[in-house]
C-alpha cells in the first residue's frame, strides 16, 4: 500500500498517509493513458474548420481559353485546385470530432495517472487548505513553501471560492474538485497537490 507524507501549508511534514492500492498503486498502463488523453483532446475540438471545394468557389463557369491552338495546357475552369484561387482538394468540412471512451477505460486511465504521480514523487498531500478571503499572495506563499514552482494541479475536497480566486491569477496553477479531475490535467501538470479530505473522497468515488 503506497504511503506518502502529509504536509501543512508551511511545508512541514506533519504525518504520513496510506493510499488505496486500488487507486494509487495500480500498474501504470501507458496505452490507456494515451487513449484517454487523445479522447479528451478530440472532445475539446471545435470542429469548425471549413474550406471550399472547386464546386463551391464562386466563378469559374466559363472555359478560360479554347481547348486547342493556344499552346497552353488545356483548362476547363479557373477554379481547379491547380490554380491560385481555386478550390481545395478534399476540403475539410465542419464535423464533430468527439467520441465516447468506455467507462472502464476512463477509470483505469485515471488510476494509472494518479499512480504515475505517486511513483514519480509528484503527488503531495496537504493536511488542510483554507482561506477566508481571496488573496493571491497567500496562495503564492503556500506553493512556495511546498516547492511547487512549476505547473500545479490543486485538488480540494469542497468548492472554496477564496482558494479558487487566489489561485486563478497564478500562471500554471489550476484548481479542481474531486469530481472534475481528469487524466489530461493530471499528466499536464508537474505537481499534483491534493488535500487530505480530497484523497478520502477520491478513494470513495473511484474505489
UniProtKB/Swiss-Prot annotation:
Region (Disordered): 43-72
SUPFAM superfamilies in the cross-refs: Ribosomal protein L4
GO CC term (a single one): ribosome
Biased composition (Polar residues): 43-52
Keywords associated with the record: Ribonucleoprotein, Ribosomal protein, RNA-binding, rRNA-binding
Keyword rRNA-binding: yes
UniProt GO BP: translation
One Pfam family this sequence matches: Ribosomal_L4
One Gene Ontology molecular-function label: structural constituent of ribosome
Superkingdom: Bacteria
Biased composition range(s): Basic residues: 60-71
PANTHER family the UniProt entry points to: 50S RIBOSOMAL PROTEIN L4, LARGE RIBOSOMAL SUBUNIT PROTEIN UL4M
Stated family: Belongs to the universal ribosomal protein uL4 family.
Subunit structure comment from the entry: Part of the 50S ribosomal subunit.
Function: One of the primary rRNA binding proteins, this protein initially binds near the 5'-end of the 23S rRNA. It is important during the early stages of 50S assembly. It makes multiple contacts with different domains of the 23S rRNA in the assembled 50S subunit and ribosome. Forms part of the polypeptide exit tunnel.
NCBIfam families for this protein: rplD_bact (TIGR03953)
Full protein name: Large ribosomal subunit protein uL4
Taxonomic lineage from the root: Bacteria, Bacillati, Bacillota, Clostridia, Peptostreptococcales
Amino acid at each position: 500500500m503506497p504511503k506518502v507524507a502529509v504536509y501543512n501549508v508551511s511545508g512541514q511534514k506533519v504525518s504520513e498517509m496510506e493510499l488505496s492500492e486500488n487507486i494509487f498503486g495500480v500498474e501504470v498502463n501507458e496505452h490507456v493513458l494515451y487513449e484517454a488523453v487523445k479522447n479528451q483532446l478530440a472532445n475539446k475540438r471545435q470542429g469548425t474548420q471549413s474550406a471550399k471545394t472547386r464546386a463551391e468557389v464562386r466563378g469559374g463557369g466559363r472555359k478560360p481559353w479554347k481547348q486547342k491552338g493556344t499552346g497552353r495546357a488545356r483548362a476547363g475552369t479557373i477554379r481547379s485546385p491547380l490554380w491560385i484561387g481555386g478550390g481545395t482538394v478534399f476540403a475539410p468540412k465542419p464535423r464533430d470530432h468527439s467520441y465516447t471512451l468506455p467507462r472502464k477505460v476512463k477509470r483505469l486511465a485515471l488510476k494509472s495517472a494518479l499512480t504515475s504521480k505517486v511513483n514519480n514523487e509528484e503527488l503531495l498531500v496537504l493536511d488542510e487548505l483554507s482561506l477566508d478571503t481571496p488573496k493571491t499572495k497567500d496562495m503564492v506563499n503556500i506553493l512556495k513553501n511546498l516547492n511547487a514552482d512549476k505547473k500545479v494541479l490543486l485538488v480540494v475536497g469542497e468548492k472554496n471560492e477564496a482558494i479558487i480566486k487566489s489561485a486563478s491569477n497564478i500562471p500554471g496553477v489550476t484548481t479542481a474538485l474531486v469530481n472534475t479531475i481528469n487524466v489530461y490535467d493530471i499528466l499536464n501538470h508537474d505537481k499534483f497537490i491534493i488535500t487530505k479530505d480530497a484523497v478520502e473522497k477520491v478513494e470513495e468515488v473511484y474505489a
